[in-house]
A protein has these predicted regions:
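Second-shell loop/turn segments in exported
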Residues: 58-59, 103-104, 141-151
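Basic/polar, cationic surfaces and motifs that engage anionic cell-wall
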Residues: 25-46, 143-236
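Short coil-to-beta-strand
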Residues: 128-139
Length: 236
């Protein structure tokens, strides 16, 4: 989508979030403007991702095939460049010490700019237990509430997420926050010490706010929401 058209989409989304306008728009969700900013993902990193997937999920592949989940994150940093510089080097992550390095498919900046770092056909390490079936979206910022209170960033995030939902056939109940990972029915972790590992970003309470806004946008475009949320007891 051209930048001016993308701006119009974000403006319309922001207006909807503000309560202005309620007309139903049926059809395909427009693709938001996405800036391509790929991180290096050469054969070595792909092989490391396949080895990781074999250890943790029992599948020997780096391909992300038919993802079922979208996981929302925040970066605990203030600039896109700091996020990019964290994800680009293929080094063991500082928390769990494994390769490949952490990454996310998309980053939504504070001004509403959407960056794509990795194709959605490639696994990224962003959520323990779900990387084999999840698209990761990072938001530049330090808290859920900071992002929820930023109209441009929130509008871009919702438009991206809804577009991905329609493109990939992902249901609303499977749009989750990182903090909700353990209760996802898709959570799978073969390495026992990691089965309770999660993060504090995007709690259920804040994701309920996010999902309500996403549902309102989905209804306007006629995107099916799917069945009610299904949560499981953490297997740890």
């Amino acid at each position: 989508m051209r930048p001016l058209a993308a701006l119009a989409v974000l403006t319309a989304t922001a207006a909807l979030l503000a309560g202005a306008g309620s007309a139903r728009i049926t059809g395909t969700v427009p693709r938001p403007h996405i800036v391509q900013k790929p991180i290096p993902y050469p054969a070595k990193r792909r092989a490391e991702m396949a080895a990781y997937a074999l250890r943790h999920y029992g599948i020997d592949t780096w391909h992300l095939v038919h993802p079922h989940v979208i996981v929302e994150h925040y970066t605990v940093s203030e600039t896109f460049s700091s996020v990019y510089n964290t994800f680009a080097p293929d080094v063991p992550d500082g928390e769990l010490g494994e390769l490949p390095g952490d990454c996310s498919h998309f980053v939504v900046d504070k001004d509403g700019t959407i960056y794509q770092l990795v194709p959605t056909t490639i696994m990224c390490r962003h959520t323990v237990g779900l990387n084999y079936t999840a698209i990761g979206i990072e938001h530049v910022g330090s808290s859920d509430r900071e992002i929820l209170s930023n109209p441009r960033q929130l509008a871009a995030s919702l438009q991206l997420t809804l577009w991905l939902m329609q493109q990939k056939g992902i249901q609303l109940r499977n749009v989750i926050g990182h903090n909700e990972s353990l209760t996802s029915p898709y959570h799978k972790e073969l390495y026992a010490p990691w089965r309770c590992q999660t993060h504090g970003d995007w709690t259920r309470a804040d994701m309920d706010v996010y999902r309500a806004k996403l549902a309102a946008l989905a209804r306007r475009y006629g995107v099916p929401l799917g069945p009610a949320a299904r949560r499981v007891t953490p297997r740890c």
